[in-house]
């Protein structure tokens, strides 16, 4: 299996399962940060922008230069720290290289920005599954705000249920477990 191969793919009949937020939704980054516990892992450009703007650089940020399929505004792009590495991941998938980069970034003591050539939307799944206990994963909910996912047994169990709706490979589970 190559690094660019899909470790997980979202089948069309499972898309609805991923539309509802998996945690509380915030429109104010300061309020979200008051409820968050480190390390903070951000999935999405606009989420990362709001956290940085509120004074909190995420331990890990996964970005793709897009929001809701459009390029992010220059102010958003310019506020996000330069990527430490770039990986490819096609829309509707999570590539082996993206999962590996995410797992490695979570283990790294330094803040890491992972840029995705393609789409990072599904990166929230391996982020929650691979994050340490009591971490916080934050992702964007289109039209609503930022979702805070506390990495607890319950949060992981709910994300594992969603992961079970994906078409996954053995490599996916090896990397996130």
UniProtKB/Swiss-Prot annotation:
One of its GO terms (molecular function) is GTP binding. Pathway: Cofactor biosynthesis; coenzyme A biosynthesis. InterPro entries: GTP-dep_dephospho-CoA_kin (IPR007164). Its EC number is 2.7.1.237. Keywords: Coenzyme A biosynthesis, GTP-binding, Kinase, Nucleotide-binding, Transferase. Belongs to the GTP-dependent DPCK family. This is GTP-dependent dephospho-CoA kinase. It comes from Halobacterium salinarum (strain ATCC 29341 / DSM 671 / R1).
């Amino acid at each position: 299996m190559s690094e660019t191969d899909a470790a997980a793919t979202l089948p069309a009949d499972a898309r609805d399962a991923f539309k509802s937020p998996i945690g509380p939704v915030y429109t104010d980054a300061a309020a979200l940060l008051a409820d968050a516990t480190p390390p903070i892992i951000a999935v999405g450009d606009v989420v990362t922008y709001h956290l940085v703007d509120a004074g909190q650089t995420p331990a890990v940020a996964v970005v793709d230069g897009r929001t809701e399929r459009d390029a992010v505004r220059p102010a958003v792009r310019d506020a996000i720290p330069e990527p430490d590495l770039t990986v490819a991941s096609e829309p509707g998938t999570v590539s082996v290289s993206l999962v590996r980069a995410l797992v490695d970034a979570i283990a790294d003591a330094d803040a890491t920005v992972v840029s995705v050539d393609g789409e990072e939307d599904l990166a929230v799944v391996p982020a929650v599954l691979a994050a340490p206990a009591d971490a916080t994963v934050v992702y964007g909910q289109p039209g609503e705000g930022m979702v805070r996912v506390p990495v607890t047994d319950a949060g992981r169990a709910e994300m594992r249920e969603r992961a079970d709706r994906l078409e996954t490979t053995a490599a996916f589970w090896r990397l996130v477990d």
